[in-house]
Swiss-Prot record:
Organism name: Flavobacterium psychrophilum (strain ATCC 49511 / DSM 21280 / CIP 103535 / JIP02/86)
One Gene Ontology molecular-function label: ATP hydrolysis activity
Alphabetical UniProt keywords: ATP synthesis, ATP-binding, Cell inner membrane, Cell membrane, CF(1), Hydrogen ion transport, Ion transport, Membrane, Nucleotide-binding, Translocase, Transport
Keyword field contains Transmembrane: no
Cellular compartment(s): Cell inner membrane
Designated name of the protein: ATP synthase subunit beta
Length: 503
């Protein structure tokens, strides 16, 4: 088939119009990718969004349009954007169009070596539903909003309350213990965090660059010539990045690029059997934000709060692909930025509908110095039922919620009249609730350099035992401070006895 060739007719920021003149020229299809070779030899990829009139298509650019001018030649590829697949993608870093950004050379994407980033969600009869719990070793999550294997998990929070630290801790706890494959999609977040994550994955052995490279890294070097390419196939993770400095086209598509690789791992290809995959996205809000940045330029009328009118459709098309089939499962953890701490904003509100478990991070709790700053009363989980978790776990979670809810209701009275006006029973409830609140905190492995405390993983049995002891009043004699940033209840008791001895 002869290539379709057009010319750039209009450029408005990231949106480029391309005109295809000539008789019987077949316009590129919606979501096809087009390529422009710039004067410096670099390739600019565009994605068709709409057809205007008889011979013009409107496209979004996947990279900066700086230096582009009208009249540039545009070549149609006849395919959507593709990501490389196969055993060689393990341990690699890609951008939105599937080019390697780790300096280790590009992988082929043509024919069977590539997979389109736009795909249909699995059919209804292919879906699998299981209700197995995924324990994370983080007390507040495992007790109050337990995650399910093959489920969708959202971490909601405003700016600076700890979403990325929590997602990094989950990668540390689940990806290392899980032993399966992980895909990390960095969508419109800080490049520094991506770099930190890669170094952390190398140190923990999830990504394997070989011993020679690790020696050079320990000495402060980054010598890519020492990377053991065949050994890299033993890696357990793949990264796809479209960070803050990228144009909106890349940020609006990079989540789909990462998802395509996760789907390939899940479904397998040919002899490859499907696998259980972890899919981390930081941050899913930037996917929506990028869509809203280009929506008006694409000629769409804005809807509520200036978001694109297709917000729910775009989110639904992506979220329905993140699912578990009878071939394999995708367990996804998505960080969701909450603009101005308003959970009713259309972007986080649309995301809520798709999730099995939500972990809401609260600024009020962060201000108390309780980390992770999870709000136990706002967070939810589909599998918090006695049938799945057992009566002991369920009852303990309800008792914790009950005592915290009572404390919340009494806070207005305390603020106006003071603690003295409470009944003895209420005073006791408040003092226990404050201990519970502090015991929900925990030192993280990834935050050791901030806290100076060694990170801990807490078994669910120890978590249940600890909270039951506090609520039953067995530890009323210990000071509140003893419960802050402790793992197990034994650590808290030891710290409390020490404080009492020193007092």
């Amino acid at each position: 088939m002869s290539k379709v060739i057009g010319k750039v007719s209009q450029i408005i920021g990231p949106v480029v119009d391309v005109v295809f003149n000539g008789k019987d020229v077949e316009l590129p299809k919606i979501y096809d990718s087009l390529e422009i070779t710039k004067k410096d030899g670099t390739l600019l990829v565009l994605e068709v969004q709409s057809h205007i009139g008889e011979n013009t298509v409107r496209t979004i650019s996947m990279d900066s349009t700086d230096g582009l001018s009208r009249g540039y030649e545009v070549v149609g590829t006849g395919n959507p954007i593709k990501m490389p697949i196969g055993a060689d993608v393990y341990g690699r870093l890609f951008n939105v169009i599937g080019d390697a950004i780790d300096g280790l050379g590009n992988l082929p994407k043509d024919g069977d070596n590539g997979m389109s980033i736009h795909r249909q969600a699995p059919r209804f009869e292919d879906l699998s539903t299981s209700s197995e719990v995924l324990f994370t070793g983080i007390k507040v999550i495992d007790l109050i909003e337990p995650y399910s294997k093959g489920g969708k998990i959202g971490l909601f929070g405003g700016a600076g309350v700890g979403k990325t630290v929590l997602i990094q801790e989950l990668i540390n706890n689940i990806a290392k213990g899980h032993g399966g494959l992980s895909v990390f999609a960095g969508v419109g977040e800080r490049t520094r965090e991506g770099n930190d994550l890669l170094r952390e994955m190398l140190e923990s052995g999830i990504i394997k660059y070989g011993d020679d490279f690790m020696h050079s890294m320990e000495n402060g070097g980054w010598d890519l010539s020492k990377v053991d390419m065949p050994g890299m196939r033993e890696s357990k993770a793949t990264f796809v990045f479209g960070q803050m400095n990228e144009p909106p086209g890349a940020r609006a598509r990079v989540a789909l690029s990462g998802l395509s690789i996760a789907e390939y791992f899940r479904d397998g290809a040919g002899s490859d059997q499907g696998k259980d995959v972890l899919f981390f996205v930081d941050n899913i809000f930037r996917f929506t934000q990028a869509g809203s940045e280009v929506s008006a330029l694409l000629g769409r009328m804005p809807s509520a709060v200036g978001y694109q009118p297709t917000l729910a459709t775009e989110m639904g098309a992506m979220q329905e692909r993140i699912t578990s089939t009878n071939k394999g499962s995708i367990t996804s953890v998505q960080a969701v930025y909450v603009p101005a701490d308003d959970l009713t904003d259309p972007a986080p509100a649309t995301t809520f509908a798709h999730l099995d478990a939500t972990t809401v991070l609260s600024r009020k709790i962060a201000e108390l110095g309780i980390y992770p700053a999870v709000d136990p009363l706002d967070s939810t989980s589909r599998i918090l039922t006695p049938q799945i978790l057992g009566d002991e776990h369920y009852d303990c979670a309800q008792r914790v919620k009950e005592i915290l809810q009572k404390y919340k209701q009494l806070q207005d009275i305390i603020a106006i009249l003071g603690m003295e006006e409470l009944s003895e029973e209420d005073k006791l409830s408040v003092s226990r609730a404050r201990r519970v609140q502090r015991f929900l905190s925990q030192p993280f492995h990834v935050a050791e350099q901030f806290t100076g405390l060694k990170g801990v993983l807490v078994d669910i049995k120890d978590t249940i035992k600890g909270f039951n002891m506090i609520i039953d009043g067995e530890l009323d004699h210990l000071p509140e401070a003893a419960f802050n940033l402790k793992g197990t209840i034994e650590e808290a008791i030891e710290a409390g006895e020490k404080m009492l001895a020193e007092a």
